[in-house]
Amino acid sequence: MPTINQLIRHERKKVVKRKKTPALQGCPQRRGVCTRVYTTTPKKPNSALRKVARVRLTNGLEVTAYIPGEGHNLQEHSVVLIRGGRVKDLPGVRYHIIRGTLDTSGVQDRRQRRSKYGAKRPK
């Protein structure tokens, strides 16, 4: 515990909060172009082939974004919209691609949580 004199000589340091989605620069979403679409494997207890894409954003930054849902139509030069939100078992993946916008199609035959995957209401 510092004395009053110590506080007068050196003021307390502010704790700097780290942004969880720095590439969005305070925006809710950002547009970008896929530079590479590939699969990667998750961290230790899990096993799968997770679909991810490298995306060059309109602000010039390049990030890795997760492609949610079953099946996708993305390839190189696809224009996508990304949002914040990390994938817990993929290190370095801090963003999600939004399904059903721009060049990204919605998930086919999706019946529950459709709005999260850009799927239309089934007839």
Swiss-Prot record:
One Pfam short name: Ribosom_S12_S23
Domain of life (superkingdom): Bacteria
Residue positions, PTM 3-methylthioaspartic acid: 89
Region described as Disordered: spans on this chain: 102-123
GO terms under biological process: translation
GO CC terms, sorted: small ribosomal subunit
Keywords: Methylation, Ribonucleoprotein, Ribosomal protein, RNA-binding, rRNA-binding, tRNA-binding
Biased composition (Basic residues): 111-123
Molecular function GO labels: rRNA binding; structural constituent of ribosome; tRNA binding
Family: Belongs to the universal ribosomal protein uS12 family.
Quaternary context: Part of the 30S ribosomal subunit. Contacts proteins S8 and S17. May interact with IF1 in the 30S initiation complex.
NCBIfam families linked: rpsL_bact (TIGR00981)
Biological role stated in the UniProt entry: With S4 and S5 plays an important role in translational accuracy. Interacts with and stabilizes bases of the 16S rRNA that are involved in tRNA selection in the A site and with the mRNA backbone. Located at the interface of the 30S and 50S subunits, it traverses the body of the 30S subunit contacting proteins on the other side and probably holding the rRNA structure together. The combined cluster of proteins S8, S12 and S17 appears to hold together the shoulder and platform of the 30S subunit.
Protein known as: Small ribosomal subunit protein uS12
